[in-house]
Curated annotation (Swiss-Prot):
First-tier enzyme category under EC: oxidoreductase
Name of this protein: 2-oxoglutarate and iron-dependent oxygenase JMJD4
Hydrolase keyword on record: no
Residue ranges constituting the JmjC domain according to the UniProt record: 147-306
Positions with a binding annotation for Fe cation: H194, D196, H274
Quaternary structure annotation from Swiss-Prot or TrEMBL: Interacts with ETF1. Interacts with the ETF1-GSPT1 complex.
Organism: Mus musculus
Amino acid sequence: MDRETRTFAERYYRDLRDPVPSGGGGPTPSGVTFIQTPNAFSYADFVKGFLLPNLPCVFSSAFTEGWGSRRRWVTSEGKPDFEYLQQKYGDAVVPVANCGVREYNSNPKEHMSFRDYISYWKDYIQGSYSSSRGCLYLKDWHLCRDSLVNDLEDIFTLPVYFSSDWLNEFWDVLNVDDYRFVYAGPRGTWSPFHADIFRSFSWSVNICGKKKWLFFPPGEEEALRDCHGNLPYDVTSTELLDTHLYPKIQHHSLPIEVIQEPGEMVFVPSGWHHQVYNLDDTISINHNWVNGCNLPNMWHFLQQELQAVQHEVEEWKDSMPDWHHHCQVIMKSCTGINFEEFYHFLKVIAEKRLLVLEQGLKGDSGDSRSLDLGLQQAAFDIGRLADVLASVVVNPDFQRVDTSAFSPQPEELLQQLEDAVAAAEAL
């Protein structure tokens, strides 16, 4: 990030009415921008045109032309190279969802060896895309986290546009998880209607095959809720024509449809609900990521999640000792993170950015790997962290969290960030 882009981004957030927005974007677009040429599209262009206004876009296959996975995982006919994949990753244990079975608003999963999944996939194709085992979709395979393969860095090259990735930076520090996934499945596999975890951004690249995306801008999903307040499993279902079951359906807008070709890269903004279909035999690489641009959306989402938990167990509020603590425990189980872990997430990123800024102000470049996007990015990140942490520390539910063992204390960390924001004005 350069100084001009940082200034632009900081002004953008100052001009917002609510310093911690509830998670929308700009005006609803009529279509999605297609970005053709890598050399003609900068990181600053992406920040200003898509990241800040929270709008989707599609990058051409030229952006992923050098990826090893596009050379090795795919045959000359553009199909999955089953023989190579089975030889390379056959022993890996992978999660597989049955797209033909609904379990709440998702699909039931099982685990099998990648070798067995490839065998199923080949049989499925030979059976005219049908099987008594159902329509199985390999989803959420943590290849980067789990693989013992030595050449993982050649599978893909992280595009600079997505390199400010706090979510995976945090989990890499803990060395226990990540949000980098491989998806693979035959024609007809699909993902039900959803918004991405923690209201993260995501990006998705088709290594081979073709996808159809149905996008709904933030807020549009409200018209799709049924009379009980639940979102649909499948937005194309004729069930949605029942106005008694879906009383707001007449107010809904048509989705924005995107066809993603082989090699193309889709940017999914924060809070955009979507439904995705594989139109061909398809393999994709997908990342979820959070940074200073959607951190407020993540914080807003976590507050909503806690409120939902509190509503469900409201009747035990007066009789259950440590009711607020139990709500945090339930939230952690259901959402994957609670307020305590969110503070730890903020702290890890904040301390790394404060170190980069301290080194920069001293004229010491330090470890160049500490932040690929540079000193101005660190300064911008610190400002966003300060804004959100200021909201966190005054939140009544966070104030009920036992922070006695936190180091530094939240108020102390906030002061460090605010001091750093002031110091960064000179950069």
